[in-house]
Every structure is written in C-alpha cells, then in structure tokens.
C-alpha cells in the first residue's frame, strides 16, 4: 500500500479552500484532494513549532513571508496560530519574493522561515516552503 505524501519536492501546495471543521478533515483535504486551508496550516505550524522546540530546547523564532495570492492571509494566520501554540516567536516579513525570505531568515537570525506561495502554480493555489536557519530550503520531518 502506498502511503499518501503531504510534502512534495518544494513544500506543500494545493488549491486554496475553506477550512473544514476538524484537524483530520483539514489534513485529508491536502493529502487526498490537494487543497490547502487555514486549519491545516495551523496544524502544520504547530507541528513545525514542536519539532523546532525539541531540536532547540528553547523558544524558537520563525519568520513568515508570503506573496499576493488571494487566500494567503488565511494561511499565514493559520501558520501563526499553530506556531504560537507551540511557544514559537513569529516575525511577519510581509509580502516578499521567495529569495527575500532567505534574507529575512538571516537578517532576523531566525531558527526557520516559512514562505507562503505556490510560485509558478495558478493564483488559486498556494502552499508553504520551509527554510532552515541558514536560509536554505529544507525538508522538515513532518
């Protein structure tokens, strides 16, 4: 049996959709229908926060950037809420190109960065890319 994959080669992406009522439904929307929503991003933010807290044994700092896609405000809000629930300090870089997030991670001395975008995908899609403390794209163990 093939296990569904949540994280692709360049982050998590999908069509922006409304948030379902439960965390499980939100994650199933990504895995089975490739739909992203604020609730799923809250769960993702919480998971990232827990991983960082375990690795760093402190209150990690994460910088979030995003592009102008409709629906990104909902996704950023979800990530922020999830990170805060794991005691992560969040800095919003605001609307920035993906290479700008690299600079924001380094400039703020953050432990990680999250870029909410879907790059070249249609404007109805969005997602999140992960950056490590050196501003490099990485593949967190989610």
Q: Model-found features: residue ranges?
A:
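An N-terminal, well-structured beta->alpha segment
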Residues: 1-79, 85-86
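Ferredoxin-reductase
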Residues: 55-137
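Short, intrinsically disordered, charge-balanced linker/junction segments flanking boundaries
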Residues: 140-142
């Amino acid at each position: 049996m093939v296990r569904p994959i949540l994280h692709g080669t360049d982050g998590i992406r999908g069509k922006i959709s409304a948030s379902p009522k439960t965390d499980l439904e939100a994650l199933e929307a990504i895995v089975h229908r490739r739909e992203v929503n604020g609730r799923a991003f809250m769960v993702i933010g919480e998971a990232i926060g827990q991983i960082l807290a375990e690795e760093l044994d402190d209150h990690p700092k994460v910088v979030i950037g995003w592009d102008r896609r409709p629906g990104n405000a909902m996704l950023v809000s979800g990530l922020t809420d999830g990170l805060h629930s794991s005691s992560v300090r969040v800095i919003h870089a605001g609307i920035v190109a993906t290479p700008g997030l690299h600079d924001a991670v380094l400039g703020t001395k953050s432990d990680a960065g999250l870029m909410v975008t879907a790059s070249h995908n249609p404007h109805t899609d969005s997602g999140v890319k992960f950056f490590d403390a050196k501003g490099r794209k990485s593949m967190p163990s989610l």
